Curated annotation (Swiss-Prot):
Species of origin: Mus musculus
Residue pairs linked by disulfide bridges in the UniProt entry: 70-73
Family according to the record: Belongs to the glutaredoxin family.
The keyword Transferase is annotated on this UniProt entry: no
Protein's UniProt name: Glutaredoxin-2, mitochondrial
PROSITE patterns: GLUTAREDOXIN_2
InterPro entries named among the record's database cross-references: Glutaredoxin, Glutaredoxin_euk/vir, Glutaredoxin_subgr, Thioredoxin-like_sf
PANTHER family found in the cross-reference section: GLUTAREDOXIN-2, MITOCHONDRIAL (PTHR46679:SF1), PTHR46679
Keywords assigned: 2Fe-2S, Disulfide bond, Electron transport, Glutathionylation, Iron, Iron-sulfur, Metal-binding, Mitochondrion, Nucleus, Redox-active center, Transit peptide, Transport
Domain called Glutaredoxin: residue spans: 50-150
Gene name for this UniProt entry: Glrx2
Quaternary structure, from the entry: Monomer; active form. Homodimer; inactive form. The homodimer is probably linked by 1 2Fe-2S cluster.
Length: 156
């Protein structure tokens, strides 16, 4: 599928609000800007891949489902790194059951390609979509919304 079509699918999903995870306000912290490596949680749980994906999305402001050899994934990570935004990177090619998680992401987002990027509990698209949002000045406000929600949740 072309990048234009993928971007169109991503925009429709974001606009429709169909791709949401658990509690839309996600935990996360601005800081080093470096992504976390995949935890042992992935693939070893008795919960389904979709549930593990949704839990990760709901617990992190920015989640990048990626592969270590993917140049588009590296580009997307660099955008968040350069903005000094912490993100959770889930490297699908490093997981024993990575194909099952990629299949689940395909069902959730309509695309099998990586990266699959979620901000503030919502699917925003792939690398091209993320780059476009950043150039338009819309990416950082999405991240800030998540941190504001997190602060509000901590107060209550």
């Amino acid at each position: 599928m072309s990048w234009r079509r993928a971007a169109s699918v991503g925009r429709r999903l974001v606009a429709s609000g169909r791709i949401l995870a658990g509690r839309r306000g996600a935990a996360g912290a601005a800081g080093s800007g470096m992504g976390n490596s995949t935890s042992s949680f992935w693939g070893k749980s008795t919960t389904t891949p979709v549930n593990q994906i949704q839990e990760t999305i709901s617990n992190n402001c920015v989640v990048i489902f990626s592969k270590t050899s993917c140049s588009y994934c590296s580009m997307a990570k660099k955008i968040f790194h350069d903005m000094n935004v912490n993100y959770k990177a889930v490297e699908l090619d490093m997981l024993e059951y990575g194909n099952q998680f990629q299949d689940a992401l395909h069902k959730m987002t309509g695309e099998r390609t990586v990266p699959r990027i979620f901000v503030n509990g919502r699917f925003i698209g792939g690398a091209a979509d993320t780059h476009r949002l950043h150039k338009e000045g819309k990416l950082l406000p999405l991240v800030h919304q998540c941190y504001l929600k997190k602060k509000q949740e901590e107060r209550h």
